[in-house]
Amino acid sequence: SNTRNFVLRDEDGNEHGVFTGKQPRQAALKAANRGSGTKANPDIIRLRERGTKKVHVFKAWKEIVDAPKNRPAWMPEKISKPFVKKERIEKLE
């Protein structure tokens, strides 16, 4: 019931995908898994919370890690794990 929608924005203010999550961080992790950022060169993810003027700005990257020991059969041995780091919140005018 308290799922929030976050819209992915680019530098020009175009809005692309919608990621859902209870927290902005949860949505950012989903977005990070689609990106191509690395720890040395992270992506910048800008998520606008739908219905608000707040844009959550994250640095995002993913690393290839070993899958957990108890992974389901369909999961490969190496998985990409997303990381996000909150930078700031911007207010839209």
Swiss-Prot record:
Alphabetical GO biological process terms: DNA protection
InterPro entries, per the entry: MC1 (IPR008674), MC1_sf (IPR036620)
Classification via Gene3D superfamilies: Chromosomal protein MC1
GO terms, molecular function: DNA binding
Record's keyword annotation contains DNA-binding: yes
Signal peptide stretch: none
Entry keyword set: DNA-binding
Domain of life: Archaea
Annotated Pfam families: MC1
Segments for region (Disordered): 1-44
Annotated function: Protects DNA against thermal denaturation and modulates transcription.
Protein name in UniProt: Chromosomal protein MC1
Lineage: Archaea, Methanobacteriati, Methanobacteriota, Stenosarchaea group, Methanomicrobia
